[in-house]
Amino acid sequence: MGFTDETVRFNLDDSNKKEISETLTDVYKSLNEKGYNPINQIVGYVLSGDPAYVPRYNNARNQIRKYERDEIVEELVRYYLKGQGVDL
């Protein structure tokens, strides 16, 4: 697949937003309870796709794997921009 100079639209289904947010919160709590740095572990998972960054504790690994990594990134960006006062 070649690259183009044209801007490509990237669209994801909005129906999972709340569920992804809740899942990230649950995974964060599980990582914290196990003594990991939750931010580092979640970033490691999102960048690599390696589920070993998230423990099985409290079913955290299975929870986060329900979503594609691009869906998780989209929710993180949306949450950040809303926090910066951007009207989405």
Curated annotation (Swiss-Prot):
InterPro entries: IreB
Superkingdom of the organism of origin: Bacteria
Family that this chain belongs to: Belongs to the UPF0297 family.
PANTHER family noted in UniProt: UPF0297 PROTEIN YRZL
Name of the protein this chain belongs to: UPF0297 protein SSA_2241
Source organism per UniProt: Streptococcus sanguinis (strain SK36)
